[in-house]
């Protein structure tokens, strides 16, 4: 967890790395146990595609995945990449064992902070089976108004 500020506005970045087995339950537990504030961004490998578009095989999502999506929605969180790219099939992970691609690495943010997210993109990596995700945020500098001037 990283806590800091950008342009005098607090931000918390939380990294999650879910296990391969039990990922859905782990992520759901982590999300519900966190005190998700408006300026909290959750990043990491959750080992779960959240939509059929997040798999090269376009499989239906499981009931457990829908439960996780419901939890994300109840916590007023959004999948920032999918929000910015609702129709784009782009992946963060290649499974050489299965010969498939998926987007199992995610950045989640609070719905109320949507205006602070400028752009998001997946950056290819040649050194890892996972690609990086870059999120640009747009925090406006606060101006101080002085009525005595």
Feature map (PLM): residue ranges:
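A shared catalytic/ligand-binding motif for oxyanion handling
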Residues: 1-149
